[in-house]
Amino acid sequence: MERPDFFTLKNGEKAKLPFSNEEYNQRLNKLRSIMDKDNLDMIILTSMHNIAYYSGFIYCSFGRPYGCIITEKKIVTISANIDASQPWRRSHCENIIYTDWKKDNFLKAITSIIDENKIPKNIGIENDHITLEMNEKIQLIFSASALTDISKKLMKLRMI
């Protein structure tokens, strides 16, 4: 039996989120304007606070990586199989669940979001949160892309 590297699962009803969909969309629009100014094709969020701020989902990692991928048109959370469809129910966006059957399925889930014909040239990451190991793996997968620290800009966007 072939086990999947990642999959989607939408079961149950969407939960009431802390903020309205309009609020999350306003936050995303502000972030996308930064992406446009800084020529970023994609952002990989990894911190609990930024994933929650932009998607509504608050994770508990249990030693597994979590992420939220933001492009010009998409926002997708990447979560571990242990959470099943909870991240989809507790966010205003799509979700991809990665499995633990093989190493680095988290990264495979990230690359599944990208159009194969449009590899991102510039990717924003959170240098104040991402581990050195994950940073190296992202650099290997996106070897033709430049990684840019956007952690300070993200923090400013969260300020009222």
Regions found by a protein language model. Name each.
Residues 50-52, 84, 131:
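Glycine-rich nucleotide phosphate-binding loop and flanking beta-alpha elements
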Residues 1-13, 23-28, 104-160:
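Flexible, acidic/His-enriched mid-domain "rim/lid" segments that flank
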Residues 59-61, 93-94, 139-142:
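Short, solvent-exposed amphipathic alpha-helical segments in soluble enzyme
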Residues 46, 99, 126:
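Conserved residues at the C-terminal ends of beta-strands
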Residues 78-108:
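Compact, glycine/acidic-enriched structural inserts
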Residues 66-80, 124-126:
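Short internal beta-strands
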Residues 1-72:
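Terminal domain-start leader segments
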Residues 56-58, 89-90, 135-138:
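Short amphipathic alpha-helical segments
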